Amino acid sequence: MTTSNSNGNRVALVVGSGSVKCAAALGLWRVLKREGIELDMVVGCSGGSLYTAAMALGFEQEESEQLTMKLWTRKVTDERNWRGLLSVFMPKALKFDSDFGLVKDRAVLASLTSFFGDRTFADTTTPLYIVATDLHNGEKVVLSSGRIVDAIRASIAVPWVWPAWQVNGRWLVDGCMSDPLPVDVAMKEGANIILAMGFESPGAGRVRSAIRYAFQLNSIQTNNLLRASFAFHNLAHHTEIIPILPDFKRAIGLYSTRHIPYVIEEGERAAEAQLPYIRQLLAAAA
């Protein structure tokens, strides 16, 4: 079996934003485990942070699938924050602030806590990096210490939808706002082979609610940043970046948990398509 540390290679997995589509990472993970390919680090952004965290902690795949079923349900966006909505029109009276969101975050936070508990980055067996965005200056923020729930909660804080999350005194929002596929984090940490799983979001034909409108704007920005990121990092000379881009023939929406088995299969298929090249790189001297 091939292992990632043979010949001095350092292999990283980066999983970008994509909500339910990020479950495709479980299919990729299945291929890596079957082939005996070890990861030296994992990097997650937005929805991708859920699965990279599960991998880094050594959770079983079945457990991670259950997380998907619990998290991406209508319940997490059903509890409207009416005070927050009114604060848009009466900002002074209702004290509009950085923690604004159209949806209360109690359900999503409860789901994350039930799965990850109080585990911290120190509990991981594989180095983990989670990317969020500073709300006030737009900087990309790489989290690698503290509670994992806090890091994920910050990384999935879709602007306008869920409130920003405070970590180490900084108000943080969705990592996709600064970099939807942060391969540069893995490069800076010394990876020379990077498996980059990214997702594009198709535009919605009709936008029927403020929540959908917020997600649509988020998708447009994410798609543009993703394309720009790939174009830029493909110019790297000392790092092999292997794009793993699942090709979904079905429409995968925010709440499409019934399609999770299909999403995982497509992730596995996309990984297998790149497997010969991955083996070739691992067999070569770093």
Language model regions located:
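Patatin-like phospholipase
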Residues: 1-45, 53-286
